[in-house]
A protein has these predicted regions:
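Non-catalytic interaction-recognition regions
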Residues: 1-94, 112-597
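Short, charged, solvent-exposed linker or helix-capping segments at domain edges/interfaces
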Residues: 95-100
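Flexible, low-complexity linker/hinge segments
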Residues: 101-113
Length: 597
């Protein structure tokens, strides 16, 4: 904050004048004053005692008196046990608000051609099922992180790796071939990803029937699966796919295209997008090539059964399979190839993988393998590891068909938002189109905010009912407050009030108003902190605190009915800047805010 920098400079000058000592800004510990004490900023004086050779209280008193004489930003001070509490002059707060008011994109660092390039991978779906609740948290975190990193002055490439090949894909293909009767998205009226997901579940159920019958004959579960003709057919289909069989490839392409059309609808509704999409089918051969190079160089080794492994025991890990005995690849193989292609395609300064914490070990291994293969970027990979998300009912499983689909969840959220908004009268005097748009904005905002306000590293339970409350730490509470401020500003415009670009520094404001300005000013630091910690939750909870503080101000003070024109203008400018920061912060979370509600 500018005021802190100004006072820090004065403290440095004061230490020099009072004690003849040179100190740097990093030695000046200036922090927000605790609520139970009077003041805005508190200086910790203990680091200066060896310079002053006096008690903490006396040192604080002398520095306070110096600031009062020499720094106009300091209006008064008090000393509590060696802590110097400073009250900032009223004119400084108004001046700070003027400065923020001049900046439409306050807190956002502009991106230039020289800015570092950050690539962020998120989503990573399989083409054998629709996106589910787990993908929702992944997509929302990845998209929000991309906006936060851009706001910190980075060029951004949002990327997705689609797992479009492998045995799990062949299971859906085989089920469609055997029992699909030529079903298409058009003939069934289903989204393509949902249709293919149905066949994945069907395969799982048919496999259970077959293995249970074999187990009834006395076979163990493992023996039954090994003798399963269905699994044998699926493996044969995968072998044919890898061999480039035309019929298998044509079926694969047709079914994957159905899925992509479905995914695109889901991404559009969710409000997330990508700059570059990679497909495992296009990267796994690159990975296999790199593994074979590593084998030739003695970095990896081959076992008797023909499989290729990496021995990472000297790195404190175990042995890692890279190619199966039949020559087929594993996820690690593909990730090696994808990483290589990405760094060939872009001058990446930082590569961030948004992937759940169950893959912590995987990315630890990937980083070491890339380093062993001689890729400098290996050590710099960032795994943005996040916790699992569940519904109150418990975990999700896709093989049994009991998974919570992203499409169904979003539709349910919008429907609930519509009902609650109607009950509360928030859709009155709106056209059906406007009302539907508000239901969409509030429903999706509820979902996004509830997920993003949680520390990404923690497991969480998504509670739809709690998320859509218009009170408390929720998206609708923030959205409604924004709409309320916009309503006040519209009424001011209707009364012919033009907001001044600069407020005079000659009138007094309350402590609550000073605190609100301080909170607005904090936004720039919050954006930096969110980028440093890779945490949208920093932004979400800051915006909630700001909105909560504004609502208290709105309750306690008149705005349009204020008789003093200077104070009225000040409160309107203050409100406008709260709205500006709320909109900016919610945008970093990928959440829309309505102009009216």
């Amino acid at each position: 904050m500018v005021i802190e920098q100004q006072i820090t400079g004065a403290i440095i000058a004061g230490i020099k004048e009072l004690y003849g000592a040179d100190v740097t800004a990093s030695q000046v510990q200036l922090q927000k004053t605790k609520k139970e004490f009077k003041g805005h900023l508190t200086l910790v004086v203990f680091p200066f005692l060896r310079m002053s050779k006096k008690s903490p209280e006396q040192t604080a008193q002398e520095i306070g008196e110096y600031l009062l004489r020499n720094e106009p930003a300091v209006a008064e001070f008090n000393v509590i046990k060696g802590f110097l509490n400073l009250t900032v002059a009223c004119s400084c707060w108004i001046d700070l608000l003027n400065s923020i008011n001049e900046q439409p994109a306050y807190g956002i660092i502009p991106v230039t051609e020289q800015s570092p390039l950050v690539m962020i991978e998120y989503s990573s779906p399989n083409t054998n099922k629709p996106l589910h609740l787990g993908h929702v948290r992944n997509n929302l975190l990845g998209y929000s992180l991309s906006k936060i990193m851009k706001a910190n002055g980075n060029q951004i490439v949002k990327t997705n790796i689609v797992n479009d090949r492998g045995i799990h894909i062949c299971k859906s293909m085989l089920a469609w071939q055997k029992w699909g009767n030529g079903a298409t998205p058009e003939s069934t009226g289903k989204k393509g990803d949902h249709l293919i997901g149905d066949f994945y579940v069907l395969f799982s159920n048919k496999l259970k029937e077959e293995t249970h019958a074999l187990e009834a004959k006395g076979l163990t579960k493992e023996e039954a699966e090994a003798q399963s003709t269905l699994m044998a057919e699926a493996r044969e289909m995968l072998r044919k796919w890898e061999a480039g069989d035309k019929e298998v490839r044509a079926l694969w392409e047709m079914m994957n295209n159905w899925v992509y059309a479905g995914f695109n609808e889901t991404y559009k509704m969710m409000g997330v997008d990508f700059d570059k999409i990679y497909y495992e089918s296009q990267t796994y051969l690159e990975g296999k090539g790199k593994v074979m190079e590593g084998l030739e160089k003695g970095i990896f080794y081959r076992r008797e059964d023909g499989s290729v492994w990496a021995d990472l025991t000297k790195d404190g890990l175990d042995e890692k399979l890279l190619l199966r005995a039949d020559g087929t690849s594993v996820y690690m193989t593909q990730d090696i190839g994808t990483a290589k292609l990405r760094f060939d395609d872009y001058p990446i300064n930082k590569m961030i993988y948004v992937v759940g914490n169950e893959q912590n070990y995987h990315f630890q291994v990937l980083s070491i393998l890339l380093d062993k293969l001689g890729f400098e970027f290996g050590k710099g990979l960032v795994h943005f590891s996040y916790g699992m998300v569940e519904l109150p009912e418990g975990k999700m499983k896709s093989r049994e068909g009991t998974v919570v689909d992203a499409d169904d969840l979003m539709a349910e959220m919008i429907s609930t938002a519509r009902e609650i908004s109607q009950e509360l009268g928030k859709l009155n005097e709106m056209t059906p189109e406007e009302a539907e748009n508000i239901a969409r904005i509030v429903g999706l905002g509820s979902l996004k905010y509830f997920i993003l306000k949680v520390d990404p590293r923690k497991n969480m339970t998504f509670n739809p009912k709690e998320s859509i409350d218009f009170n408390g730490n929720t998206g609708p509470f923030i959205q409604y407050t924004y709409a309320r401020i916009r309503s006040v500003l519209r009424k001011a415009a209707e009364q012919g009030i033009a907001l001044p670009e600069q407020l005079p520094l000659t009138f007094a404001i309350s402590e609550k108003e000073e605190n609100l300005i301080q909170m607005i000013a904090d936004y720039a630091e919050i954006v930096k902190e969110a980028g440093k910690l890779y945490s949208p939750a920093c932004v979400a909870n800051y915006i909630y605190d700001l909105v909560k503080e504004y609502n208290q101000f709105y309750h306690d003070f008149s705005i349009l009915r204020e008789e003093n024109p200077e104070l009225k203008n000040f409160r309107l400018v203050l409100s406008a800047n709260v709205a500006k920061i709320v909109k900016s912060g919610m945008d970093l979370l990928g959440i829309e805010v309505p102009e009216r509600m």
